[in-house]
Amino acid sequence: MIGASKLIRIWINARVYPAIAGAEIINDAVIVAKEGRLTFVGPASALSIDDRDAETIDCGGRLITPGLVDCHTHIVFGGDRAMEFEMRLEGSTYEEVARAGGGIVSSVKATNALTVDQLVQASLPRVDTLLSEGVSTLEIKSGYGLTIEGELNILRAARALEKVRPVRVVTSYLAAHATPPEYKGRHADYIADVVLPGMDRGHAEKLIDAVDGFCEGIAFTVDEMRRVFNHAKVLGIPVKLHAEQLSNLGGAKMAASYGALSADHLEYLDKEGAEAMAKAGTVAVILPGAFYAINETRKPPIQTLRDAGVRMAIATDCNPGTSPLTSLLLTMNMSATLFRLTVEECICGATREAARALGILDTTGTLEVGKSADLAIWNIERPAELVYRIGFNPLHSRVFKGKQVST
């Protein structure tokens, strides 16, 4: 018998989808958490507990999954890019918008005009929308500063968001996102003057959990990203990469050679790149919001990824220009409908594999003893409903680190 205390919470009368490979739904399930950590997940018949002093929550037969993980966002920014949306409707491509001075650079001015506190306030409505759909963990990238201070302010805002909302924030340093106008044609100088010293400062301030980059014809070359990743390696910071979104430069293969946590987008990934990712354990992060928003026609090679044994995560890619999306539930539906991911691939892609893509699978992403008690409790009969519905939020309540934080 487990001795209970007021620090123990017990969820009874539940059905549990643990998101563990090969595991089935546990009916008539019980979840026990102590001091925010899971101590039991399984059938009620397998547990004996003295619950006189514990808080017991009757789930009414609802389905419980791990709290969702959005593993790729640019959610901290100022302004919007609705005008570019109109440009694309009139026929301009993503590359044409970027080469005309729009795209990422156009968000920089609006973002750098805000203080850290103002960035937090601007981002909260977007963050709150994701949390309302069961998200417990959120990755946030810099990339709209393009100066040392601008990049670090975005990361400071990301850290601050974790203090004002019940959410786990994982940060990525993305100074190698674009070059500002004053460095046009001088990528090497920008890397030397901004990217590398900014990484040093961010690392010293404990603002950086991973280093990211945009490897593409309109951004940085493979060799330029190697320079950035070599510096991250010296500092002991994990890396990840936006790769093969608009063309195949071999970025995913290069990232895999550094043991990258993930390579993201991947519409133009080839078999060689997929095999390199599989060998390195690099997760493929699929981003249907960007594919949809820029009216892309080339889909990521899902079957090639499956055949190679690459694990797949999905994410919103929430950003002001190419994926103004704040619904991980809709992202699941897009992944299934546009890219033919299975229900299991979608749900595990927004939980287990998303946590793996952030390097935090030991903390969250599945419902297993020892992990954080991050739960999403749903008013649904079967898991497929999370993927099947469009524009409907069936969340009943959210639990973060063992505490109910929203209904």
Swiss-Prot record:
Cofactor: how and how many bound: Binds 1 zinc or iron ion per subunit.
Domain of life, source organism: Bacteria
Enzyme class: hydrolase
Gene Ontology CC terms: cytoplasm
Listed InterPro entries: Amidohydro-rel, HutI, Metal-dep_hydrolase_composite, Metal_Hydrolase
Binding, N-formimidoyl-L-glutamate: Y144, N319, G321
Its EC number(s): 3.5.2.7
Entry's Gene Ontology BP terms: L-histidine catabolic process to glutamate and formamide; L-histidine catabolic process to glutamate and formate
Gene Ontology MF, one: zinc ion binding
Catalysed reactions, as listed in the record: 4-imidazolone-5-propanoate + H2O = N-formimidoyl-L-glutamate
UniProt subcellular location: Cytoplasm
Ranges in a coiled coil: none
Pathway membership, UniProt: Amino-acid degradation; L-histidine degradation into L-glutamate; N-formimidoyl-L-glutamate from L-histidine: step 3/3
Keyword terms, alphabetized: Cytoplasm, Histidine metabolism, Hydrolase, Iron, Metal-binding, Plasmid, Zinc
Residues the entry annotates as binding Fe(3+): H72, H74, H242, D317
Chloroplast keyword on record: no
Function: Catalyzes the hydrolytic cleavage of the carbon-nitrogen bond in imidazolone-5-propanoate to yield N-formimidoyl-L-glutamate. It is the third step in the universal histidine degradation pathway.
NCBIfam families, alphabetized: hutI (TIGR01224)
Name listed for the protein in its UniProt record: Imidazolonepropionase
